Amino acid sequence: MASNAASLNAVRETMDVLFEISRILNTGLDMETLSICVRLCEQGINPEALSSVIKELRKATEALKAAENMTG
């Protein structure tokens, strides 16, 4: 039981550090999104490909918002 608590604490600390790095680098990722990205990388997803997908999704979101503002 103590081992599980220690492992959970280590994971939380690691995620806190990763989130701080993410914030310093101004990635715009929230803790939940960062956690999903970490899990995907742990499962073998290429981090560079994941980064490209995130950038493309952000561009598409911005384009949709711009289109809504023009028609809305």
Swiss-Prot record:
Q: Which compartments is it annotated to reside in?
A: Cytoplasm, Cytoskeleton, Microtubule organizing center, Centrosome; Cytoplasm, Cytoskeleton, Spindle
Q: Name one GO biological process term.
A: mitotic spindle assembly
Q: Work out whether the entry's keyword set contains Ribosomal protein.
A: no
GO CC terms: centrosome; cytoplasm; gamma-tubulin ring complex; interphase microtubule organizing center; spindle
Which Pfam families does the UniProt record give?
MOZART1 (PF12554)
As for family, the record states: Belongs to the MOZART1 family.
Q: Quaternary state and partners of this protein?
A: Part of the gamma-tubulin complex.
Q: This chain belongs to which protein, by name?
A: Mitotic-spindle organizing protein 1
Q: Which organism is it from?
A: Taeniopygia guttata
